[in-house]
Structure formats: structure tokens, C-alpha cells
Amino acid sequence: ARNMTHALIDSIKEKKGHVVILSSAAAIFGMFGYTAYATSKAALLAFAESLRYELKPEGVSVTVVCPPEVDTPMNYDEAKTLPPEGRAVKSLGGFLMPDKVARDIIDAVKRDRYLLVPGFTTRVLYALHRFTNGAISRITADAVIKRARSKH
């Protein structure tokens, strides 16, 4: 994200463009089995926020997207190696179709929204997460992981 943004920044500034950073719901919630992935996606949130502050005076907007699981071949391949606890936690956010996420991104850009959390379930979980300072996410994930482990 940093390299691509750096390569295109002059053109984006000239056209008063819009930068879209694709992160993940894992950046917000963290996930069992996704320590490195969640960390890298959380870094994208910080990158997007910093970029927003730097580019706003130049007329450039930034949107960061944090979707749950999206129906792509990558997720089918990953499911073959994911531990039961990871599968159980991932299922909490729902499963979105790529065209729905794309439409949501286009809408967010048109509305100049900074943060996009696609999917009703994920938005509700995000609101609860913020309202409870993450407690509800930890309690829910702990219960889901415990249940997944008891089945195996």
C-alpha cells in the first residue's frame, strides 16, 4: 500500500483523487490463528489514518476498507489449513460476495467516507466492539474458540 501510494501520489494530488486502502475486519478485532495477518492489516489502518491527515489539506481523500471474509478462491484454499478455532471465529463476521464489497467501496468513495466496514453483521460487531472497548469481542471470541476446541 505504501509503495503504490508513493508511486502515484503526485498524480492523485494533481487530480484531487481518492486513495482506497484495503484492510480487513481482522485489523479491528484480531483473530485466532491470524496474528501476523491481523497485525499487518492493523498497520494499514494506521497508515490510512496518517495518510488522511497528510493528504486532506491537498484535497485528497482516503477510505480504508475492513471487510470480513470475502468469497474468493484465496479463502477456499485457506480453509483447507485453517484450525477449527480459526474457522469458528471467522464465521462470526459473515461471508460477503466480492461484487457487494466493490459496490460498498464505490459508495464510500462517493460519500467521502473514511472507514468502511462492509456487511451488516460486521458493522454491528464493530459498533459493539467500540461501545464495550473490545470486551464483547474478547468474550465472544473466547466462547467460540472454547466451543470449537470442545468439538475436536
Residue ranges and their predicted role:
Residues 5, 40:
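Active-site helix of classical SDR
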Residues 10, 53-57:
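Alpha-helical segment proximal to the catalytic Tyr-Lys
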Residues 11, 27-29:
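Conserved catalytic-site region of short-chain dehydrogenase/reductase
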Residues 31-35:
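Active-site loop immediately N-terminal to the catalytic Tyr-X3-Lys motif
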Residues 57-120:
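SDR active-site lid
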